[in-house]
Amino acid sequence: ADKFSDIADRIGEALDFMEACGVDPQVLPQLQRTSFYTSHEALLLPYEQALTRRDSLTGDWYDCSAHMVWIGDRTRFENSAHIEFARGIGNPLGMKCGPSLETDALLKLLDTLNPAREPGRITLISRFGHNKVEDGLPRLVRAVKAEGHPVVWSCDPMHGNVVKSDSGYKTRP
């Protein structure tokens, strides 16, 4: 309760400061609403398909389960059902890229998922771990850049950095 009270007080102080500086929240629409985006792995295709809808104006298909869905390391291979599903929707897409991904395979997947090379469509999420990132990531970055694919690079520092306990549970430091 004390922590909440402290946070509420700090927010109040920030709002008072903004008012003192002449910032009026009633005039600035940016201070009246919040853009909120969600993302998750499109792992369970029956779930994703049940939440996929056709846009009535454009006829394009969108997965309404999230703003961006991503494809994981184990389902990210050419001709997989997951790639086929992702290819058919208009959502921004993420794709995990780790030590098992070869450059040729990545380039083929990018051609499949974003043949028009639309900027902002694909986010590549590195998941190498601290001990493999220097060997694996630069080759992928060079190949993608050389082919001119407009991707966003993102890092998932949790994946690839696991420690397995004696009981077999995976933990992350």
Set out the residue ranges of the language-model regions.
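Active-site-facing alpha/beta catalytic cores
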Residues: 1-129, 171-172
